[in-house]
Structure formats: structure tokens, C-alpha cells
């Protein structure tokens, strides 16, 4: 978890090299002033996939934190906002596919972002909403973390920033918003109260309140958030309790921590990221599953592109274990 404070420093500028007007060996351009080593670039497959949902199909190979510092240093007197600010604060998820947006007090006309240029806008901010960050021996101005979250939520709600989620079209923005708030709470230690204060006058209060109510500080990834929102619908249908980060102990030792669990039905849910594909991790997962089965728990594991089957799997297992639906679930927008 990142410790955030006004005046903090960032190492994101350490890999920036002056752009001499030609591409140096092993480097790629960030903008007209800076280059970064190619080894930091995002995988082509992910970049292409993300660009499909960008409003102008812009492809961003350079991670957001490097673009953020490069553009801020190249545009002195501006303020870094939204997803770019969150990337610089250390948010590890959801930030890399979007424009870097700078607020310029002298701007006459809004400018769109592109692969090598930031978006430029003109907005008013209160003095207490501005932080200073040291980078490469210089100070850059960045919006305070809660304000950055709210600015990102504005872009999500207006569908200017999107990524794939399992939800109906009218509920997609809500799911993405909860994912962003979850990540901000988990990795940046932001509170719902601070986000709510920053949201006044910027985002619809009722919508923001529903997002904050549905959020959690325990989700370790956006996909885990997505899994929780789906599982909550099933829990409501069956009148069951859903818990997060449930620990299992044996002989005084922690055996596993399930991402989610239905205690009454003894079902444990896991979202397994890419690191679970290596042999040693798979072996450990198998050992955990065998232990859970031995104590009459049913482990269910999900990975990339597998969450669409979660509802059906849960319903089958719950019925096998003697549970029946007690209510039809409200939609996610029922929180609105």
C-alpha cells in the first residue's frame, strides 16, 4: 500500500531519458521531450484490446505513470489529473489505457490526447485540492488523490473511459466505478468519506453514494471486485451471507484465504490471476482444494474469461447442498 502525502516524491521519472530527436537504441518515445526503455512497454495484445474501447482508438504502449511524468514535465504550470494522477500515486490497475489529462490555466481551447500528447483542459480547482510531487528534481502539480478518483469516476460515468466487465449495458459504468473505488481503497488507502467529499459538485451524489456503498477495501484486483458483485446477486437470491477474505486454519497454521465464501453453504471462491499458471502455484492450489474438500467445503476457481459461468456454477452447487432461491435479485442499478 502506498503512503500518500503532499510533497511526496515519485521514481516514475527515473526511467525517462531526454529525447534527442531520434530514437535511441532500445528506447521508445513518450513525447517530444522524453523516451523510455522498451522493456517497460505494455504487451501489444493488451494495448490493442484496450484501444478498441478508447473513444478515438488511441493505443497506449507506454504505461500511464511514465506518460504522466513526461507530459507534466513537458508542460510546466499544468496540473496532472484523473487516471494519470492515480497512476503516479501508485494505483496498479485500470489506469494504463486512458489519456493523460492536464489542466492548463492558460488554455484557450480544449485539446484531445493522443499517443504522444496529453489532453489539455481548463478547469477550476481549490488550493487544497492541489498537491506537489517531486520528480527528477522538479516539482509537478497533481490533484489530491480523492479528487483524482472522482475525476476518473466522471470519465467512467460518461463512458469516456471503459474496459470489459460482465454486466448489462446500463450497469457497466456502475461496475467499473466500484472496481476503481475498490482499487483506490485497497492500494491507496483512500476512504469512502474522502471520495464523497471530493465528489460534491462533480458527480451525481446519489450515484456516487451507491458506488461507495457497494465498494470494499478488501478486493485485491478489479476482477475480484467483479466476482464479488456477481456473487452478491446470487447470495441475495438464496438469502445467504457472502464474506470476503475468509481464512482457513489447520494445526495453528494458515492454509488459505479464500477471496469470497458462502459460510452457510461452505463454498469458497477464488479469482486466480496469471501467476497461478506456473507449475508451483498450480500444485499449491491443488493442495488447497484437496484440503477444503476434506473439510466438506467446495472450492470454485475462476480465471480470465471464466466469470460468465459463475452464476450457473453457484446455483448448481447451492441446490446440490440443499439451498433454494428465496427472492429474485434486484439489478445492480437497484443500488441507484
Model-predicted segments: where are they?
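Short gly/ser-rich loop at a beta-strand->alpha-helix junction or flexible surface loop bordering the NTP-binding
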Residues: 1-201, 334-336
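Surface segments flanking catalytic/ligand-binding clefts of nucleic-acid enzymes
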Residues: 7, 185-336
Amino acid at each position: 500500500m502506498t503512503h500518500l502525502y503532499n510533497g511526496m516524491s515519485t521514481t516514475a521519472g527515473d526511467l525517462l531519458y531526454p529525447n534527442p530527436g531520434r530514437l535511441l537504441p532500445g528506447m521508445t518515445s513518450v513525447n517530444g521531450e522524453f523516451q523510455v526503455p522498451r522493456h517497460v512497454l505494455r504487451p501489444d495484445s493488451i494495448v490493442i484490446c484496450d484501444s478498441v474501447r478508447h473513444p478515438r482508438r488511441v493505443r497506449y504502449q507506454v504505461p500511464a505513470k511514465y506518460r504522466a511524468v513526461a507530459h507534466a514535465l513537458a508542460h510546466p504550470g499544468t496540473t496532472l489529473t484523473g487516471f494519470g494522477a492515480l497512476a503516479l500515486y501508485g494505483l496498479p490497475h485500470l489506469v494504463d489505457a486512458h489519456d493523460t489529462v492536464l489542466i492548463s490555466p492558460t488554455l484557450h481551447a480544449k485539446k484531445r490526447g493522443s499517443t504522444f500528447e496529453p489532453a489539455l483542459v481548463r478547469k477550476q480547482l481549490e488550493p487544497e485540492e492541489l498537491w506537489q510531487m517531486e520528480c527528477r528534481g522538479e516539482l509537478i502539480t497533481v490533484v489530491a488523490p480523492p479528487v483524482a478518483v472522482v475525476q476518473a469516476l466522471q470519465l467512467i460515468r460518461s463512458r469516456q473511459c471503459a474496459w470489459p466487465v460482465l454486466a448489462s449495458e446500463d450497469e457497466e459504468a456502475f461496475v467499473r466505478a466500484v472496481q476503481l473505488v475498490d482499487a483506490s481503497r485497497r492500494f491507496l488507502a483512500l476512504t469512502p468519506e474522502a471520495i464523497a467529499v471530493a465528489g460534491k459538485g462533480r458527480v451525481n451524489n446519489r450515484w456516487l453514494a451507491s458506488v461507495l456503498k457497494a465498494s470494499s477495501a478488501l478486493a485485491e484486483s478489479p476482477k475480484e471486485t467483479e466476482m464479488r458483485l456477481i456473487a452478491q446477486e446470487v447470495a441475495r437470491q438464496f438469502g445467504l451471507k457472502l464474506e470476503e477474505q475468509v481464512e482457513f486454519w489447520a494445526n495453528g497454521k494458515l492454509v488459505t484465504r479464500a477471496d469470497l465464501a458462502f459460510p452457510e453453504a461452505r463454498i469458497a471462491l477464488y479469482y486466480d490471476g496469471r501467476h497461478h499458471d506456473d507449475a508451483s502455484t498450480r500444485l499449491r492450489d491443488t493442495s488447497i482444494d484437496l484440503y477444503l474438500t476434506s473439510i466438506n467445503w467446495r472450492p470454485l476457481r475462476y480465471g480470465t474469461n471464466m466469470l460468465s459461468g459463475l452464476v450457473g456454477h453457484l446455483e448448481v452447487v447451492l441446490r446440490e447442498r440443499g439451498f433454494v432461491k428465496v427472492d429474485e435479485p434486484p439489478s445492480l442499478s437497484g443500488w441507484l
